[in-house]
């Protein structure tokens, strides 16, 4: 009886034989792709996939069949909102022996191939999405074998993923209703990008609160931005240029609210004496601006932690159903809002 042949991991030489190039060319194509032609690079990458070669040290633990690596896809790494979510993810991952890689979707076109390579060569065990979009076209055949995925912060039902987030509609409703209770009836909204689901829900909360309070929704009182300081500043100026500018403004993010606050001051307005402003997220800067910003506090660290725990359950073979896991949020009253006299 013949002994069963022991399986061995594919080597760079196997890739070279399959691609009909030298091992030096394989090394350059995989480690320094700019040093070879696109055709050679494609041939080597195809051969690597076919023979199952995984470059070291990012290769998988053969014995345990895992890389102990998680990929976190962030819409914009420069947005301070994501720092605490990432921290919650990293601390939880480290406690379970996992390394976290960060992928920045703000430069998606340049990074898309990198994300795909990590997935198709099985160099990551799971993915956490902090936005509503996959950083690649999942319809392409070679990308169908995706690792376990969990979404945090956003909610996109079409992706059918387990999701950890707050009730954005109710949070926005409560913020706008608070402004109404302070006597404000001309309430503006600085909204985020229309294509983002969370912005849709926050805008719905704004609209529903106005209607509940018997206030007609005026489209002129809604200005849009892209979650940057500059966008908040520009949107605030748009609202201030109206014949009857708002006496209070609800912003979809703290970053835009801080930009709006700065612009209001540049125009000679006093906050909150002349204008009340509410943000969303409770990033650290909101406590130290002048005046400190009233905002919706999200449990960002806990969102990251819970999302990572769900992903760990998935990777360990447990069934994790799709749909929302809602976290609590809170309206934090600070110095940027006041009751009208």
Curated annotation (Swiss-Prot):
Q: DNA-binding region located at which positions?
A: 12-31
* Family matches, as Gene3D superfamilies: 3.40.50.2300, lambda repressor-like DNA-binding domains
Q: Does the keyword Repressor apply?
A: yes
Q: What's in the keyword line of the UniProt record?
A: DNA-binding, Repressor, Transcription, Transcription regulation
Task: Provide a Gene Ontology MF annotation, just one.
Answer: transcription cis-regulatory region binding
In terms of InterPro entries, this protein maps to: HTH_LacI, LacI/GalR-like_sensor, Lambda_DNA-bd_dom_sf, Peripla_BP_I
For this record, the Gene Ontology CC terms, alphabetical, are:
cytosol
The molecule here is called HTH-type transcriptional repressor CytR
Q: Which branch of life, at top level? A: Bacteria
Which segments constitute the HTH lacI-type domain? 10-64
* Keyword NADP tagged: no
**What biological function has been recorded for the protein in this entry?**
This protein negatively controls the transcription initiation of genes such as deoCABD, udp, and cdd encoding catabolizing enzymes and nupC, nupG, and tsx encoding transporting and pore-forming proteins. Binds cytidine and adenosine as effectors.
One Pfam family assigned to this protein is Peripla_BP_3
User: Which biological processes are named by the entry's GO terms?
Assistant: negative regulation of DNA-templated transcription; regulation of DNA-templated transcription
